[in-house]
């Protein structure tokens, strides 16, 4: 998918990925809106994590790699919604974790920049890391 919306979301997602992998807290803080919430599913059940909690938790992880594929992108005035397939490999609390997830990211344009205000993360339904 090579339309303008996909290109914008792909650039934002790459920037976010690069900030995560390099533990660039300043850049991550700039990319996530003050009202950011991560909503997801773990083996223990559903969870919600607000911005400061997420920024704190992400610093305890060593992200080795994140592969991204933009499956869909939609634009609405000052909002973008992206569906992203991601394959993560990270170390957290001494364990290596590999996971394939589908992300729904909602970006808002405020103060002359795009910021993620919501991220929903769920295990990939196909068990793979690409659209079915």
Language-model segments: residues:
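A solvent-exposed, acidic/Ser-Thr-rich amphipathic alpha-helical stretch
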Residues: 4-7, 25-78, 98
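Residue-level recognition of conserved beta-strand positions in structured domain cores
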Residues: 40, 84-86, 118
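A short, structured loop/turn motif at beta-sheet edges
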Residues: 73-80, 95, 107-113
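Short, cysteine-centered beta-strand-loop-beta hairpins and adjacent loop/turn segments enriched
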Residues: 89-98
